[in-house]
Amino acid sequence: QEKILQKQGRVIFGVDMKIVDDQHQELPHDGVAFGDLYVRGLWVINQYYKTLDSALVDDWFPTGDVANIDDQGNMQITDRSKDVIKSGGEWISSIDIENIASGHPEVMMAACIAIAHPKWDERPLLVIEKKPNHQLSDQELKDQLLKYFEGKIAKWWTPDDVVFVEKIPLTATGKMQKLKLREQFKEYQLPTI
């Protein structure tokens, strides 16, 4: 029952949903597999406002979300498609990493972005805005944060590095501007382990 309360819910009558992998193959509704969320139905748009081009892919609308669906049809959004980190053929949820890091008492805000990696394609880089009255040095907080993830996420999801910024850029509505962070750190070299 508690797990169901954590889900976003089920689709309404007349709407279908599915999750697909990078090759657009449908994934099982097992609550474990997650992929790009697609919907279709009478109440689903087929084109964006003031455009003539169809937004549909094989009659399905790509929501731009990454989700999983359990065997009861309960869906949970785990990330935005553009923010998921694809590492070694697996997907890492940036939102899960951000939520955990934000729980640390010295963290004001956390953003997790993908950094190019020669072996794994992408690896997570954690970008931290510290609270104004923080007590720890950057190195102390970095060490604490990397330990803070132990037991909370799969070990291979742990960010390869942590960097600190004065302010994480936000939109006018308060959403993180990950595009700006990706641009800022596009040449960043992850430490070799």
Which residues does each PLM region occupy?
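AMP-binding/adenylate-forming catalytic domain of the ANL superfamily
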Residues: 151-175, 192-193
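Acidic/polar alpha-helix N-cap and adjacent early helical turns
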Residues: 183-193
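Conserved beta-strand termini and adjacent loop/short-helix elements that scaffold enzyme active sites
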Residues: 20, 113-115, 165
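Conserved AMP-binding/adenylate-forming
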Residues: 1-74, 81-84, 97-98
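Short, ordered coil/turn segments that flank beta-strands lining enzyme active or ligand-binding pockets
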Residues: 22-23, 71, 87, 166, ...
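Residues embedded in well-ordered beta-strands
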Residues: 16-18, 36, 111, 125-127, ...
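Glycine-centered tight turns that cap/initiate beta-strands
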Residues: 14, 106-109, 161, 167
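AMP-binding/adenylate-forming catalytic core of the ANL superfamily
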Residues: 41, 47, 66-157, 174, ...
